[in-house]
Protein backbone atom coordinates (compact mmCIF):
# COMPACT_ATOMS: atom_id res chain seq x y z
CA UNK A 1 0.00 0.00 0.00
CA UNK A 2 2.84 2.41 0.81
CA UNK A 3 4.41 1.73 -2.58
CA UNK A 4 1.13 2.46 -4.37
CA UNK A 5 0.57 5.75 -2.49
CA UNK A 6 4.17 6.83 -3.21
CA UNK A 7 3.68 6.17 -6.93
CA UNK A 8 0.44 8.20 -6.99
CA UNK A 9 2.15 11.13 -5.27
CA UNK A 10 5.03 11.10 -7.75
CA UNK A 11 2.59 10.98 -10.65
CA UNK A 12 0.69 13.95 -9.22
CA UNK A 13 3.86 16.01 -8.86
CA UNK A 14 4.89 15.25 -12.45
CA UNK A 15 1.52 16.49 -13.80
CA UNK A 16 1.81 19.88 -12.06
CA UNK A 17 3.13 22.88 -14.14
CA UNK A 18 6.82 23.66 -13.95
CA UNK A 19 6.24 27.34 -13.00
CA UNK A 20 7.04 27.66 -9.28
CA UNK A 21 4.69 30.62 -8.90
CA UNK A 22 1.70 28.48 -9.79
CA UNK A 23 2.44 25.60 -7.43
CA UNK A 24 -0.37 26.71 -5.08
CA UNK A 25 -3.82 25.52 -6.14
CA UNK A 26 -6.90 27.05 -4.50
CA UNK A 27 -9.09 24.34 -3.02
CA UNK A 28 -12.56 24.16 -4.46
CA UNK A 29 -15.23 25.33 -2.10
CA UNK A 30 -18.04 22.94 -1.47
CA UNK A 31 -21.43 23.70 -2.90
CA UNK A 32 -22.89 24.35 0.53
CA UNK A 33 -20.32 27.07 1.26
CA UNK A 34 -20.96 28.75 -2.09
CA UNK A 35 -24.65 28.84 -1.40
CA UNK A 36 -23.96 30.37 1.99
CA UNK A 37 -21.81 33.10 0.47
CA UNK A 38 -24.49 33.88 -2.14
CA UNK A 39 -22.32 32.82 -5.08
CA UNK A 40 -24.07 29.58 -5.96
CA UNK A 41 -27.19 30.94 -7.65
CA UNK A 42 -25.57 32.88 -10.52
CA UNK A 43 -23.23 29.99 -11.30
CA UNK A 44 -26.02 27.47 -11.27
CA UNK A 45 -28.14 29.82 -13.40
CA UNK A 46 -25.39 30.31 -15.98
CA UNK A 47 -24.64 26.61 -16.05
CA UNK A 48 -28.34 25.95 -16.55
CA UNK A 49 -28.41 28.34 -19.49
CA UNK A 50 -25.37 26.66 -21.00
CA UNK A 51 -26.99 23.27 -20.62
CA UNK A 52 -30.19 24.61 -22.17
CA UNK A 53 -28.34 25.97 -25.20
CA UNK A 54 -26.53 22.66 -25.64
CA UNK A 55 -29.78 20.74 -25.34
CA UNK A 56 -31.69 23.04 -27.72
CA UNK A 57 -29.13 24.33 -30.25
CA UNK A 58 -31.85 25.54 -32.64
CA UNK A 59 -33.19 28.16 -30.24
CA UNK A 60 -32.50 31.79 -31.17
CA UNK A 61 -31.83 34.30 -28.44
CA UNK A 62 -33.92 37.46 -28.91
CA UNK A 63 -32.75 40.66 -27.30
CA UNK A 64 -35.64 42.31 -25.47
CA UNK A 65 -35.85 46.13 -25.60
CA UNK A 66 -34.84 47.90 -22.44
CA UNK A 67 -37.73 50.37 -22.62
CA UNK A 68 -41.22 49.67 -23.91
CA UNK A 69 -42.50 52.69 -25.85
CA UNK A 70 -46.14 53.18 -26.70
CA UNK A 71 -46.50 53.08 -30.47
CA UNK A 72 -49.85 54.89 -30.44
CA UNK A 73 -49.89 57.56 -27.72
CA UNK A 74 -53.33 59.07 -27.27
CA UNK A 75 -52.28 62.72 -26.70
CA UNK A 76 -55.77 64.09 -26.20
CA UNK A 77 -54.44 67.63 -25.94
CA UNK A 78 -53.45 67.46 -29.62
CA UNK A 79 -56.94 66.25 -30.44
CA UNK A 80 -58.30 69.28 -28.62
CA UNK A 81 -56.15 71.58 -30.76
CA UNK A 82 -57.39 69.86 -33.94
CA UNK A 83 -60.99 70.22 -32.73
CA UNK A 84 -60.52 73.95 -32.14
CA UNK A 85 -58.98 74.23 -35.62
CA UNK A 86 -62.00 72.50 -37.19
CA UNK A 87 -64.55 74.57 -35.26
CA UNK A 88 -62.76 77.79 -36.18
CA UNK A 89 -62.84 76.99 -39.90
CA UNK A 90 -66.49 75.90 -39.76
CA UNK A 91 -67.43 79.19 -38.09
CA UNK A 92 -65.27 81.05 -40.60
CA UNK A 93 -67.22 79.34 -43.38
CA UNK A 94 -70.52 80.69 -42.05
CA UNK A 95 -69.00 84.16 -41.82
CA UNK A 96 -67.73 83.88 -45.40
CA UNK A 97 -71.15 82.72 -46.66
CA UNK A 98 -72.73 85.77 -45.06
CA UNK A 99 -70.17 88.06 -46.68
CA UNK A 100 -70.39 86.43 -50.13
CA UNK A 101 -74.20 86.49 -50.04
CA UNK A 102 -74.08 90.27 -50.33
CA UNK A 103 -72.16 89.98 -53.63
CA UNK A 104 -74.30 87.38 -55.39
CA UNK A 105 -75.86 89.00 -58.46
CA UNK A 106 -79.65 88.82 -58.80
CA UNK A 107 -80.82 85.86 -60.86
CA UNK A 108 -82.78 88.21 -63.13
CA UNK A 109 -79.56 89.99 -64.11
CA UNK A 110 -77.21 86.98 -64.04
CA UNK A 111 -79.05 83.79 -65.03
CA UNK A 112 -77.65 80.36 -64.07
CA UNK A 113 -74.58 79.17 -65.92
CA UNK A 114 -75.06 76.41 -68.50
CA UNK A 115 -74.57 72.93 -67.04
CA UNK A 116 -74.72 69.69 -69.03
CA UNK A 117 -76.22 67.71 -66.15
CA UNK A 118 -79.05 70.22 -65.82
CA UNK A 119 -79.69 70.01 -69.56
CA UNK A 120 -80.51 66.30 -69.38
CA UNK A 121 -81.92 65.88 -65.86
CA UNK A 122 -84.92 67.87 -64.69
CA UNK A 123 -85.02 69.19 -61.15
CA UNK A 124 -86.58 67.07 -58.39
CA UNK A 125 -87.64 69.19 -55.41
CA UNK A 126 -87.34 66.58 -52.66
CA UNK A 127 -83.93 65.29 -53.79
CA UNK A 128 -81.93 67.78 -51.73
CA UNK A 129 -83.74 66.72 -48.54
CA UNK A 130 -82.74 63.12 -49.29
CA UNK A 131 -79.13 64.25 -49.66
CA UNK A 132 -79.17 66.00 -46.28
CA UNK A 133 -80.85 63.04 -44.56
CA UNK A 134 -78.18 60.71 -45.97
CA UNK A 135 -75.52 63.06 -44.68
CA UNK A 136 -77.05 63.09 -41.19
CA UNK A 137 -77.19 59.27 -41.17
CA UNK A 138 -73.54 58.98 -42.23
CA UNK A 139 -72.40 61.52 -39.65
CA UNK A 140 -74.35 59.66 -36.96
CA UNK A 141 -72.84 56.32 -37.98
CA UNK A 142 -69.35 57.76 -38.01
CA UNK A 143 -69.68 59.39 -34.58
CA UNK A 144 -71.02 56.14 -33.12
CA UNK A 145 -68.19 54.14 -34.69
CA UNK A 146 -65.61 56.68 -33.54
CA UNK A 147 -66.80 56.43 -29.92
CA UNK A 148 -66.02 52.71 -29.88
CA UNK A 149 -62.55 53.01 -31.43
CA UNK A 150 -59.64 52.24 -29.14
CA UNK A 151 -57.43 54.96 -30.61
CA UNK A 152 -60.22 57.48 -31.00
CA UNK A 153 -57.98 60.41 -30.07
CA UNK A 154 -55.65 59.83 -33.04
CA UNK A 155 -58.51 59.22 -35.47
CA UNK A 156 -60.44 62.18 -34.10
CA UNK A 157 -57.60 64.61 -34.64
CA UNK A 158 -57.16 63.34 -38.19
CA UNK A 159 -60.84 63.87 -38.95
CA UNK A 160 -60.87 67.35 -37.39
CA UNK A 161 -57.74 68.44 -39.24
CA UNK A 162 -58.93 67.18 -42.64
CA UNK A 163 -62.45 68.61 -42.41
CA UNK A 164 -61.09 71.88 -41.04
CA UNK A 165 -58.63 72.18 -43.92
CA UNK A 166 -61.33 71.37 -46.48
CA UNK A 167 -63.62 74.07 -45.17
CA UNK A 168 -60.71 76.50 -45.11
CA UNK A 169 -60.22 75.78 -48.82
CA UNK A 170 -63.95 76.30 -49.30
CA UNK A 171 -63.76 79.72 -47.69
CA UNK A 172 -61.06 80.74 -50.14
CA UNK A 173 -62.83 79.47 -53.27
CA UNK A 174 -66.15 81.03 -52.25
CA UNK A 175 -64.58 84.40 -51.61
CA UNK A 176 -62.41 84.71 -54.72
CA UNK A 177 -65.09 83.58 -57.22
CA UNK A 178 -68.79 84.28 -56.75
CA UNK A 179 -71.00 82.23 -59.04
CA UNK A 180 -74.63 83.02 -59.87
CA UNK A 181 -77.32 80.75 -58.48
CA UNK A 182 -77.58 77.36 -60.28
CA UNK A 183 -81.32 77.62 -60.85
CA UNK A 184 -84.22 80.05 -61.00
CA UNK A 185 -85.89 78.22 -58.11
CA UNK A 186 -83.52 79.74 -55.54
CA UNK A 187 -85.12 82.06 -53.01
CA UNK A 188 -82.22 83.98 -51.51
CA UNK A 189 -82.61 86.09 -48.40
CA UNK A 190 -82.57 89.86 -48.92
CA UNK A 191 -79.25 91.67 -48.72
CA UNK A 192 -78.50 93.55 -45.51
CA UNK A 193 -76.28 96.30 -46.98
CA UNK A 194 -73.95 96.79 -44.04
CA UNK A 195 -76.24 95.88 -41.12
CA UNK A 196 -73.67 94.19 -38.87
CA UNK A 197 -76.12 93.12 -36.18
CA UNK A 198 -78.36 91.35 -38.69
CA UNK A 199 -75.31 89.63 -40.20
CA UNK A 200 -74.33 88.28 -36.78
CA UNK A 201 -77.85 86.92 -36.36
CA UNK A 202 -77.60 85.18 -39.73
CA UNK A 203 -74.27 83.65 -38.74
CA UNK A 204 -75.76 82.31 -35.50
CA UNK A 205 -78.75 80.95 -37.41
CA UNK A 206 -76.49 79.11 -39.83
CA UNK A 207 -74.45 77.62 -36.99
CA UNK A 208 -77.49 76.53 -34.97
CA UNK A 209 -79.14 74.88 -37.98
CA UNK A 210 -76.00 73.27 -39.34
CA UNK A 211 -76.46 75.06 -42.66
CA UNK A 212 -79.15 72.57 -43.69
CA UNK A 213 -82.24 73.29 -45.72
CA UNK A 214 -84.38 70.89 -43.69
CA UNK A 215 -83.67 72.99 -40.58
CA UNK A 216 -84.49 76.25 -42.36
CA UNK A 217 -81.01 77.70 -41.93
CA UNK A 218 -79.88 77.43 -45.57
CA UNK A 219 -81.32 80.73 -46.80
CA UNK A 220 -78.16 82.37 -48.12
CA UNK A 221 -76.67 82.08 -51.61
CA UNK A 222 -73.12 82.15 -52.87
CA UNK A 223 -71.61 79.04 -51.27
CA UNK A 224 -71.43 77.14 -54.53
CA UNK A 225 -67.73 76.62 -55.22
CA UNK A 226 -67.33 74.01 -53.85
CA UNK A 227 -70.08 71.81 -52.35
CA UNK A 228 -69.93 71.41 -48.58
CA UNK A 229 -72.56 68.66 -48.68
CA UNK A 230 -70.33 66.63 -51.00
CA UNK A 231 -67.40 67.08 -48.62
CA UNK A 232 -69.41 65.71 -45.70
CA UNK A 233 -70.88 62.79 -47.64
CA UNK A 234 -67.50 61.78 -49.05
CA UNK A 235 -65.34 62.28 -45.97
CA UNK A 236 -67.61 60.41 -43.57
CA UNK A 237 -67.72 57.41 -45.90
CA UNK A 238 -63.92 57.39 -46.25
CA UNK A 239 -63.40 57.42 -42.49
CA UNK A 240 -66.09 54.81 -41.88
CA UNK A 241 -64.45 52.42 -44.33
CA UNK A 242 -60.88 53.10 -43.22
CA UNK A 243 -61.48 52.52 -39.52
CA UNK A 244 -63.80 49.51 -39.63
CA UNK A 245 -63.02 45.80 -40.16
CA UNK A 246 -62.40 44.80 -43.76
CA UNK A 247 -64.87 41.92 -43.60
CA UNK A 248 -67.72 44.36 -42.86
CA UNK A 249 -68.35 44.60 -46.60
CA UNK A 250 -72.10 44.94 -46.10
CA UNK A 251 -71.55 47.92 -43.80
CA UNK A 252 -69.22 49.54 -46.32
CA UNK A 253 -71.70 48.91 -49.13
CA UNK A 254 -74.57 50.54 -47.23
CA UNK A 255 -72.46 53.60 -46.41
CA UNK A 256 -71.24 53.84 -50.00
CA UNK A 257 -74.81 53.74 -51.30
CA UNK A 258 -75.83 56.48 -48.84
CA UNK A 259 -72.88 58.63 -49.91
CA UNK A 260 -73.30 58.08 -53.65
CA UNK A 261 -77.08 58.60 -53.54
CA UNK A 262 -76.62 61.78 -51.53
CA UNK A 263 -74.14 63.23 -54.01
CA UNK A 264 -76.37 62.38 -56.98
CA UNK A 265 -79.37 63.95 -55.25
CA UNK A 266 -77.43 67.23 -54.93
CA UNK A 267 -77.21 67.38 -58.70
CA UNK A 268 -80.75 66.14 -59.26
CA UNK A 269 -82.03 68.93 -57.01
CA UNK A 270 -80.01 71.50 -59.02
CA UNK A 271 -78.58 72.89 -55.77
CA UNK A 272 -74.98 72.92 -57.00
CA UNK A 273 -73.25 73.05 -60.34
CA UNK A 274 -71.66 69.82 -61.49
CA UNK A 275 -68.21 71.40 -61.23
CA UNK A 276 -68.90 72.15 -57.54
CA UNK A 277 -69.48 68.47 -56.82
CA UNK A 278 -66.51 67.28 -58.89
CA UNK A 279 -64.07 69.68 -57.22
CA UNK A 280 -65.40 68.80 -53.75
CA UNK A 281 -65.01 65.07 -54.38
CA UNK A 282 -61.53 65.47 -55.85
CA UNK A 283 -60.14 67.67 -53.08
CA UNK A 284 -61.68 65.55 -50.31
CA UNK A 285 -60.41 62.21 -51.56
CA UNK A 286 -56.92 63.51 -52.37
CA UNK A 287 -56.43 65.18 -49.02
CA UNK A 288 -57.66 62.07 -47.21
CA UNK A 289 -55.39 59.73 -49.20
CA UNK A 290 -52.34 62.00 -48.97
CA UNK A 291 -52.69 62.47 -45.23
CA UNK A 292 -53.10 58.78 -44.48
CA UNK A 293 -50.29 57.76 -46.83
CA UNK A 294 -47.97 60.13 -45.01
CA UNK A 295 -49.21 58.98 -41.60
CA UNK A 296 -48.75 55.28 -42.36
CA UNK A 297 -45.31 55.53 -43.99
CA UNK A 298 -42.41 56.48 -41.74
CA UNK A 299 -40.29 57.80 -44.61
CA UNK A 300 -43.02 60.24 -45.68
CA UNK A 301 -42.98 61.91 -42.27
CA UNK A 302 -39.49 63.26 -42.91
CA UNK A 303 -38.94 66.43 -44.88
CA UNK A 304 -36.45 65.69 -47.66
CA UNK A 305 -35.64 66.57 -51.25
CA UNK A 306 -37.26 63.37 -52.54
CA UNK A 307 -40.41 63.62 -50.42
CA UNK A 308 -42.51 66.06 -52.42
CA UNK A 309 -45.49 65.59 -50.10
CA UNK A 310 -43.52 67.35 -47.38
CA UNK A 311 -43.73 70.57 -49.40
CA UNK A 312 -47.42 70.98 -48.61
CA UNK A 313 -48.15 74.04 -46.50
CA UNK A 314 -49.81 71.90 -43.82
CA UNK A 315 -46.86 69.50 -43.41
CA UNK A 316 -45.61 71.14 -40.15
CA UNK A 317 -49.09 70.77 -38.68
CA UNK A 318 -49.24 67.17 -39.88
CA UNK A 319 -45.84 66.41 -38.34
CA UNK A 320 -46.94 67.94 -35.05
CA UNK A 321 -49.98 65.66 -34.93
CA UNK A 322 -48.39 62.45 -36.25
CA UNK A 323 -44.73 62.44 -35.19
CA UNK A 324 -45.31 60.09 -32.23
CA UNK A 325 -47.63 57.68 -34.06
CA UNK A 326 -45.63 54.65 -35.20
CA UNK A 327 -47.18 52.91 -38.21
CA UNK A 328 -50.75 52.18 -39.23
CA UNK A 329 -53.41 52.26 -36.54
CA UNK A 330 -54.89 48.79 -35.92
CA UNK A 331 -58.64 48.42 -36.12
CA UNK A 332 -59.38 47.91 -32.42
CA UNK A 333 -62.53 48.70 -30.48
CA UNK A 334 -63.22 49.36 -26.81
CA UNK A 335 -66.03 50.65 -24.65
CA UNK A 336 -66.37 54.44 -24.69
CA UNK A 337 -66.49 54.58 -20.89
CA UNK A 338 -64.27 52.49 -18.63
CA UNK A 339 -66.00 50.86 -15.68
CA UNK A 340 -64.57 51.20 -12.14
CA UNK A 341 -61.99 48.48 -11.39
CA UNK A 342 -64.00 46.99 -8.53
CA UNK A 343 -67.13 46.34 -10.57
CA UNK A 344 -65.93 43.15 -12.21
CA UNK A 345 -63.76 41.73 -9.42
CA UNK A 346 -64.70 38.17 -8.55
CA UNK A 347 -65.27 37.28 -4.90
CA UNK A 348 -63.75 33.82 -5.48
CA UNK A 349 -60.25 33.17 -4.19
CA UNK A 350 -57.55 33.08 -6.84
CA UNK A 351 -54.83 30.44 -6.67
CA UNK A 352 -51.43 30.43 -8.29
CA UNK A 353 -50.04 27.35 -9.91
CA UNK A 354 -47.53 26.82 -7.09
CA UNK A 355 -50.27 27.03 -4.47
CA UNK A 356 -52.40 24.54 -6.38
CA UNK A 357 -49.54 22.01 -6.59
CA UNK A 358 -48.87 22.43 -2.87
CA UNK A 359 -52.49 21.78 -1.98
CA UNK A 360 -52.58 18.72 -4.23
CA UNK A 361 -49.50 17.34 -2.46
CA UNK A 362 -51.10 17.91 0.93
CA UNK A 363 -54.23 16.10 -0.14
CA UNK A 364 -52.22 13.15 -1.48
CA UNK A 365 -50.33 12.77 1.81
Swiss-Prot record:
Pathway: Sphingolipid metabolism. Residues 1-52 are annotated as: Disordered. GO terms for biological process: ceramide biosynthetic process; ceramide phosphoethanolamine biosynthetic process; regulation of bone mineralization; sphingolipid biosynthetic process; sphingomyelin biosynthetic process. It is found in: Cell membrane; Golgi apparatus membrane. Changing residue 343 to A: Strongly decreases palmitoylation. Abolishes palmitoylation and dramatically reduces plasma membrane localization. Changing residue 276 to E/A: Completely abolishes enzyme activity. No change in subcellular location. Changing residue 272 to A: Completely abolishes enzyme activity. No change in subcellular location. The active site is at residues 229, 272, 276. Residues 296-365 are cytoplasmic. GO terms for molecular function: ceramide cholinephosphotransferase activity; ceramide phosphoethanolamine synthase activity; kinase activity; sphingomyelin synthase activity. A lipid is attached at residues 331-332, 343, 348 (S-palmitoyl cysteine). It holds the Pfam family PAP2_C. Inhibited by bacterial PC-phospholipase C inhibitor D609. Palmitoylated on Cys-331, Cys-332, Cys-343 and Cys-348; which plays an important role in plasma membrane localization. GO terms for cellular component: endoplasmic reticulum membrane; Golgi apparatus; Golgi membrane; nucleoplasm; plasma membrane. It comes from the Eukaryota. It catalyses: an N-acylsphing-4-enine + a 1,2-diacyl-sn-glycero-3-phosphocholine = a sphingomyelin + a 1,2-diacyl-sn-glycerol; an N-acylsphinganine + a 1,2-diacyl-sn-glycero-3-phosphocholine = an N-acylsphinganine-1-phosphocholine + a 1,2-diacyl-sn-glycerol; an N-acyl-(4R)-4-hydroxysphinganine + a 1,2-diacyl-sn-glycero-3-phosphocholine = an N-acyl-(4R)-4-hydroxysphinganine-phosphocholine + a 1,2-diacyl-sn-glycerol; an N-acylsphinganine + a 1,2-diacyl-sn-glycero-3-phosphoethanolamine = an N-acylsphinganine-1-phosphoethanolamine + a 1,2-diacyl-sn-glycerol. Brain, heart, kidney, liver, muscle and stomach. Also expressed in a number of cell lines such as carcinoma HeLa cells, hepatoma Hep-G2 cells, and colon carcinoma Caco-2 cells. Overexpression of the human protein in mouse causes increased non-HDL-sphingomyelin and non-HDL cholesterol levels, decreased HDL-sphingomyelin and HDL-cholesterol levels and increases the atherogenic potential of non-HDL lipoprotein particles. PANTHER family: PHOSPHATIDYLCHOLINE:CERAMIDE CHOLINEPHOSPHOTRANSFERASE 2, SPHINGOMYELIN SYNTHETASE. Sphingomyelin synthase that primarily contributes to sphingomyelin synthesis and homeostasis at the plasma membrane. Catalyzes the reversible transfer of phosphocholine moiety in sphingomyelin biosynthesis: in the forward reaction transfers phosphocholine head group of phosphatidylcholine (PC) on to ceramide (CER) to form ceramide phosphocholine (sphingomyelin, SM) and diacylglycerol (DAG) as by-product, and in the reverse reaction transfers phosphocholine from SM to DAG to form PC and CER. The direction of the reaction appears to depend on the levels of CER and DAG in the plasma membrane. It is linked to Calvarial doughnut lesions with bone fragility: A rare autosomal dominant bone disease characterized by low bone density, distinctive X-ray translucencies of the skull, multiple fractures, elevated serum alkaline phosphatase, and dental caries. Patients present with childhood onset of primary osteoporosis and typical sclerotic doughnut-shaped lesions in the cranial bones. Calvarial doughnut lesions with bone fragility and spondylometaphyseal dysplasia: A severe form of calvarial doughnut lesions with bone fragility, a rare autosomal dominant disease characterized by low bone density, distinctive X-ray translucencies of the skull, multiple fractures, elevated serum alkaline phosphatase, and dental caries. CDLSMD patients show neonatal onset of fractures, severe short stature, marked cranial sclerosis, and spondylometaphyseal dysplasia. This is Phosphatidylcholine:ceramide cholinephosphotransferase 2. The lineage of its organism: Eukaryota, Metazoa, Chordata, Craniata, Vertebrata.
Amino acid sequence: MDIIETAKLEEHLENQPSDPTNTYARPAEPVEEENKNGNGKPKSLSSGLRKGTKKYPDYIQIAMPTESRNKFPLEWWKTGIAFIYAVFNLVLTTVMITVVHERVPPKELSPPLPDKFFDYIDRVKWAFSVSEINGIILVGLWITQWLFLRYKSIVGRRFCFIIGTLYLYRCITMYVTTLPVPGMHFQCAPKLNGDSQAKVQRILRLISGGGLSITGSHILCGDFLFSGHTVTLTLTYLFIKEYSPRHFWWYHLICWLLSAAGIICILVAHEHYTIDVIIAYYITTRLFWWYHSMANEKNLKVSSQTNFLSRAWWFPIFYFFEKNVQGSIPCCFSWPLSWPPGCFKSSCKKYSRVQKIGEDNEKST
